[in-house]
Structure formats: C-alpha cells, structure tokens
Amino acid sequence: MIVNPSRSIATAVHIALLETTPEYFLQVAQWHHQECERQGVKSSLALRQQRLVLHVQESRIPKTLVALFDGKLIGCVSLVNYSYRSSERMPKGANESPVWLSNLFVLEKYRQQGFGNALIDAAKHYASDLGQDELWLSATDYTDYYQKRGWEIIRRTRLAGRQVNVMRVGL
C-alpha cells in the first residue's frame, strides 16, 4: 500500500505488513519494548518478541504494519484484540472482541510530517477490510492528537498504574 502522507513530502511512504518485511521484526520489537518502558509498563525484549511473533503468523489479528520511507523503516502501528473476562470490564459500547489500535510509533526525526496519519489510515483500512466498523485505543500522552483525527473519549481509567483515555473511532 502506498500512501502520500503530506504534501510537503515529495516521495511516498510505503506501508506494509510486518509479516511481509521480516527483516524489520527485531527493530519493531525493540521499539515496542522501549515504549513499554517509557510508559512504565514492565517489559522485556524477549517478551515483546514473543508477542510480536503472533503478528506475523497467518491470523487476521493481531497484525503490525510498518512504514518505510526512502527504503528506511521509520514507524509502525499494531492492531490487536484485547479479551475481557467480564462485560463489566469491557468499555461501554464495545463489541465482544473489539480491535484496538496499539503501538503507534514514528521515529522522532519523521514526526509531524504525516507518517503517523498514514499508519493510522492504513490500520483503519485493514480493520475495515476485516469487517470491523470501529477501532479502539488507550492513550495517555497524545489524546489531543487522536481527537483531532475523529477519535472520541469513551471513558477514563487506570492502566498499569497510569491514567488513560479509552477512545473509539468509527470506520
């Protein structure tokens, strides 16, 4: 999938499934681990790799998409299912197994140039192709970023000891 994320960028970004670009697996796992640690979530690189393996198998979800610009890996985003043990823990309005946008990451040098938008758009398209009619996410730091892109806050809760906003967008 080719996306032109911003008029200021002359060449296009290429968005691909991680399973089709296995050479980037270790870097993506490192980014996931790094972001978990930044957010105060207990993690290990081995655990991130173990979980990411599920994203490159034949199942439809979980999946990770990567962004390549000028032949270089610059970002990623994941689609995952979080299972709930009871309907009381499920966000109000969620279906039984909602798809969540997770692990959005763009290298700092490439931020604020439309690459994050391109990754989100590609993830939304992928989820829509699977028959999903909405995506969910939890955000701590960048709630405004998502709200400007049509996401709505459904509730606020605590996750891994941090206050987060649970958000949803229709597809």
Predicted regions span which residues?
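Active-site rim helix/loop that mediates acceptor-substrate recognition in acyltransferases
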Residues: 40-69
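C-terminal "cap" of GNAT-fold acetyltransferases
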Residues: 133, 137-142, 155-171
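Conserved acetyl-CoA pyrophosphate-binding loop and the N-cap/start of the following alpha-helix
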Residues: 110, 114-122
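Conserved acetyl-CoA-binding loop of GNAT-fold acetyltransferases
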Residues: 147-157
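Conserved beta-strand in the GNAT
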Residues: 64-66, 72-82, 87-90, 100, ...
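Conserved N-terminal entry element of GNAT/NAT acetyltransferase domains
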Residues: 1-27
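Helix-loop element at the rim of GNAT/NAT acetyltransferase active sites that forms part
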Residues: 29-43
